Regions:
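Bacterial N-terminal signal peptides
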Residues: 12-24
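Flexible coil/turn and secondary-structure edge motifs
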Residues: 6-7, 21-210
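Bacterial N-terminal signal peptides that target proteins for export
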Residues: 2-15
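Low-complexity intrinsically disordered segments
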Residues: 1-2, 20
Length: 210
């Protein structure tokens, strides 16, 4: 009987814990604090940006896609022409209780070359431009404040040319682009190394890069 009683107590504990978690989530929503939030960043090849955010505690999901242009439902082939207006982006779903938007922006800077216009590393064209796409006024203020602070403390001499612009319609990229660093690790490492991304980040940011 003792094992049965212990099991019952354990199940009772689990029930109470689950209730507490659901109550906490409901309370957070009642206070106007979303359980999840979105952030969107363009930092050149979306494979690399996706990998960077997949490592961040509090990030729930990342999706590679396109944003910033006027062409509806663009394909990768269309975007790579540089004529759609879209940039390769990664939309980040995160838990604001575990990671702040400001922290995500801070990580963004250290994974791009903010001095490079119309491209990132070995990839050139407006589709590879760097940009922060804000989803509300609070994100806009945080992004702009971060850029001002970086301008004063940056460890490099170049001018910061990264755009800060309002988010528009997000179009998810084709399935083979999603989680590319996980599905195709060898090809991904070959591309990233050949593109000189890590080397340039270290040159710009030192040990804080990447």
């Amino acid at each position: 009987r003792k094992p049965i009683m212990n099991a019952r107590r354990w199940l009772s504990f689990l029930g109470i814990a689950a209730l507490a978690l659901s109550t906490g989530a409901a309370a957070a929503q009642a206070e106007g604090k979303p359980a999840t939030a979105r952030a969107t960043f363009a930092g050149g090849c979306f494979w690399c940006v996706e990998e960077a955010y997949d490592k961040v505690p509090g990030v729930l999901a990342t999706t590679s896609g396109y944003m910033g242009g006027k062409v509806k439902d663009p394909t990768y082939e269309q975007v790579t022409t540089g004529r759609t207006g879209h940039a390769e982006v990664v939309q980040v779903e995160y838990d604001p209780a575990k990671v702040s938007y400001a922290k995500l922006v801070e990580g963004f800077w250290r994974n791009i070359d903010p001095t490079q216009k119309d491209g990132q590393f070995c990839d050139y064209g407006p589709q590879y431009r760097s940009a922060i796409f804000y989803h509300d006024d609070e994100q806009k203020r945080a992004a702009e404040a971060s850029r001002v602070a970086l301008q004063k403390t940056k460890p490099f001499k170049g001018e910061i040319v990264t755009e800060i612009t309002q988010a528009s319609q997000f179009y998810a990229a084709e399935g083979y682009h999603q989680d590319y660093h996980v599905k195709n690790p060898a090809r991904y490492k070959f591309y990233k190394s050949g593109c000189g991304r890590d080397a340039r980040l270290q040159q710009l940011w030192g040990k804080a890069g990447g």
